[in-house]
Amino acid sequence: MRLSPHEQERLLLSYAAELARRRRQRGLVLNHPEAVALITDHLLEGARDGRSVAELMVSGREVLTRADVMEGVPEMLHDVQVEATFPDGTKLVTVHDPIA
């Protein structure tokens, strides 16, 4: 199987998000990279499912709470941006202040 650099990046992101999910299920709080991976994966999968950019901008803020992440992570994470593939093309999705 040959993957382009873009596909390799998406696969790595997906794996990081899965690891973050498992850690969260075990009751661990997430660090910055894990939080970004989980939110980004939510956005990419939502786009793949046909949800709109507006829907994802709202739901992206509901993925994690302050209780889910290590101290200081919400303050470090101002925006999460990803180019997601929607049924009608690729669009940039931005979630401002994703951890409330």
Swiss-Prot record:
Localization per record: Cytoplasm
Domain of life: Bacteria
EC number assigned by the record: 3.5.1.5
Gene Ontology CC annotation, any one: cytoplasm
GO biological process, one term: urea catabolic process
Gene Ontology molecular function: nickel cation binding; urease activity
Enzyme class of the recorded protein, top EC level: hydrolase
Similarity-based family: Belongs to the urease gamma subunit family.
Record protein name field: Urease subunit gamma
Species whose genome carries this gene: Rhodococcus opacus (strain B4)
Gene name, Swiss-Prot/TrEMBL: ureA
